[in-house]
Amino acid sequence: MLLIAMASGVAAYLIYHSIPALAPAGPYLDKAVKVLQPVLMFMMLFLSFCKIAPRQMRPHRWQAWLLLIQTAGFVIPGILLTLGGRGHGSLLAESFMICMICPTATAAAVITGKLGGDMPGIITYTILINIVTAIIVPAIVPLVHPAAGISFTTAFCMIMAKTFPLLIMPCVCAWLVRFLLPDFHRWILHFNDLALYLWSVSLPLAIVVTTRSIVKSDIPVSYMIGMAAVSLICCIIQFWIGRRIGAKYGSSVTAGQALGQKNTVFAIWMAYTFMTPVTSIAGGFYSLWHNIFNSWQLYRQGHPHHHSD
């Protein structure tokens, strides 16, 4: 089902792009996607928070390791770029930085829950990594990619405004429902897979955004292939490292999703806003890789007789 959702997203944009008569609808479709995506994300997180009691939101040791890895993956290449100057590999280095620091996807809680992981753990990490990103990115970006008028405070506020409304408001609403409307809360809990179905609707929209960023790019094919390779390597490494670290604390699935499943819409926005705009393609390719991997994981979860643990 999820692979079909991804394919439909690619096909939808390519059909639109190939039919000139549809061009006037572009601005309206763009506005619709920009409204629908946050609404779907809000609903997915709201449903996830409804399943979690406030006391379950607590830090774990594996989260500290993952925060360190993401921070190092952004800061170290940033320092090397600053000291070594910009060359032919600078776009690939920026692509690596974006793929490493990008926060956990809001939909990660849905996939983690479906895979039998710890939903409170990954939601806690999602909040923590968004805070870290809002601090680290404004501190390093001016060194790597100076831009007039963007100070630490400005960049910090821009990132917080981009990410936190979709994290905090679903949490507040879910917990208000839990304590003030317990009957409604119990009714919501009957819909176990609703968040997954919402993600299946949200996924084609994300793939449309990804496909558009790739199709509209005018960079040489060699750079595009390089960014695709960098994003694939980052995806594989982060899922693998996350699972390895998580396994030591009994949270293999949760840590793997926390480090590997990214908010690629944010990655694309961050590339356009703070880095070289063409590096947004790396975020687009990462969206393909992690969604393919998630589809495979969910398939294995639903067909346990096809593999052995």
What function would you assign to each model-found segment?
Residues 1-309:
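Alpha-helical transmembrane segments of multi-pass small-molecule/ion transporters
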